[in-house]
């Protein structure tokens, strides 16, 4: 039986979680210290050597070697549902996985920096055929510090369930398979 005490414990748990998230935002310097990967744009669908064989021409044009790429954060890419921990970084490097937003969009994008000059960055999803339009430093939300495979899946499932109740068509990046969530 659900009691007032149970309700109070649930409310307290939500408040503690919210306070923890806000504290994490202050410590990391970004309003988004934890994000979930919502598309397959960073997914490597094959072993690294095979993946590199199909992508090497693009990266070679940018003077990024196979050895360079293997030293980048998450050289084997990210999967839909991975949970990322983010920190503010006003000077990310080539190879860093960054989170950014486009003006007028509510969505954030998780892609890798493949080129830069001054405070302009070219990003690309490892699984995408072409790079994104350039972004500025002001669009950056942060840089990925580490990833925890699939721990973001419950958040995506809750987002999907909420969208069903609200009657909003769900688009988890256009490529994220709900069967894997």
Question: Could you say what each language-model-derived stretch is?
Answer:
Residues 30-32, 102-111, 132-138:
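Short coil-to-beta-strand transition motifs
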Residues 65-67, 94-105, 124-132:
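Short aromatic-glycine motifs in intrinsically disordered, low-complexity regions
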Residues 1-92, 148-181:
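Protein maturation boundaries and topogenic segments
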Residues 79-82, 93-96, 138, 142:
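Solvent-exposed, polar/charged alpha-helical surfaces in well-ordered, non-transmembrane soluble domains
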Residues 114-161:
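Extended, hydrophilic extramembrane loops/domains of integral membrane proteins
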Residues 91-93, 104-106, 116-119:
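Short, charged/polar surface micro-motifs in flexible loops or helix N-caps
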Residues 96-98, 109-115:
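Short beta-strand-centered aromatic/proline hotspots
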């Amino acid at each position: 039986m659900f009691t007032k005490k149970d309700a109070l414990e649930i409310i307290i748990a939500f408040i503690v979680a919210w306070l923890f998230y806000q504290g994490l935002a202050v410590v990391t310097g970004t309003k988004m210290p934890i994000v979930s990967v919502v598309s397959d744009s960073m997914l490597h669908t094959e072993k690294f050597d095979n993946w590199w064989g199909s992508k090497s021409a693009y990266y070679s044009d940018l003077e990024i070697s196979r050895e360079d790429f293997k030293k980048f954060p998450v050289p084997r890419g990210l999967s839909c549902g991975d949970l990322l921990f983010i920190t503010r970084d006003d000077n990310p490097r080539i190879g860093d996985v960054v989170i950014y937003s486009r003006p007028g969009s509510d969505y954030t994008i998780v892609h890798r920096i493949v080129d830069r000059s001054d405070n302009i960055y070219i990003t690309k999803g490892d699984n995408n055929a072409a790079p994104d339009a350039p972004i500025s430093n002001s669009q950056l939300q942060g840089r990925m510090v580490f990833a925890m495979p699939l721990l973001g899946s419950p958040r995506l499932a809750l987002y999907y369930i909420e969208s069903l109740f609200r009657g909003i068509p769900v688009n988890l990046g256009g490529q994220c398979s709900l069967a894997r969530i």
